[in-house]
Amino acid sequence: MSGGLDCLALKEDDVQKFLASGAHIGSSNLDYQMTQYVYKRKPDGTYIINLRRTWEKLLMAARIIVAIENPADVCVISSRPYGQRAVLKFGAHTGATPIAGRYTPGTFTNQIQAAFREPRILIVTDPRSDHQPVTEASYVNIPVIALCNTDSPLRYVDIAIPCNNKSIHSIGLMWWMLSREVLRLRGAISRDVTWEIMCDLYFFRDPEEAEKEEQEARDRATAVKEEPAQPYAEQWSDPVAVPPAGQPVAEVTDWAADSVKAPVAGIGTYGGPSEDWAVADAPAAPAAPTPAAPSQEFTATDDWGGAASNDWAISS
């Protein structure tokens, strides 16, 4: 398919991308029409796709897309979530019309609905999951290009690009290579220069993981922000010097310079406040002894209610 041209030959860098994304790994089932694209079968029953045939079909599909004058007449569809980001990026870079998500039945056949389209060529991610647009394309004679696995049905498929259409990285890489080859054939980018768009842009990203990464980035940015320096007083009794508005606060670089030593309290008995911290506290005067209370002597009497008396006739 490359016609012996070195510029169209499969490069080693592209082969490494194919192997890293797992584009050569098929499924454990094999459709009889996909037998020609199988290289060998692994001991565990998984089929290996011939990457040379994948590259040839990729070039053929790119040449067909470039032959269409209006890029908007190319319709790319992916109902599976793994290929929706890829078809949207493909449409943004090549000018094709993407349909990501649920396909509305009758888009190609029902002329009275608002979503009616008449594309000149249709490209689908999986002919099994996108069977509705493939079937409708056969009704109105629209050629179909599909990314096909070893077990994909080829009914109504005109050009099958053999690859792994189940892997996230494989789907993104195939759409990225197809868009790169289309732009090269149009002359938009040079073959001697590496395309500035990375294939990671075509990979599917989970919205929850993307939101988590954005939240972590915001948290890191918040932690990096430094708080502004606040004015301080050297003594507790000194007023705080507040700089005027608009003037930056001087930053303290050496906290050990001109530091004020705090007074150290004595170990002895506290003798009251002193104006001069350098003067030692005077020893406290000894306390005077407390006088003892006078002792009282009591005389035993027979009369418990009054004083002692010898005359019993006298009332107390």
UniProtKB/Swiss-Prot annotation:
Residues 209-240, 283-316 are annotated as: Disordered. It holds the Pfam family Ribosomal_S2. Residues 215-228 have a biased composition (Basic and acidic residues). One of its GO terms (cellular component) is cytosolic small ribosomal subunit. GO terms for molecular function: structural constituent of ribosome. This is Small ribosomal subunit protein uS2. CDD domains: RPS2. It is found in: Cytoplasm. Component of the small ribosomal subunit. Mature ribosomes consist of a small (40S) and a large (60S) subunit. The 40S subunit contains about 33 different proteins and 1 molecule of RNA (18S). The 60S subunit contains about 49 different proteins and 3 molecules of RNA (28S, 5.8S and 5S). Interacts with ribosomal protein S21. Keywords: Cytoplasm, Ribonucleoprotein, Ribosomal protein. Belongs to the universal ribosomal protein uS2 family. SUPFAM superfamilies: Ribosomal protein S2 (SSF52313).
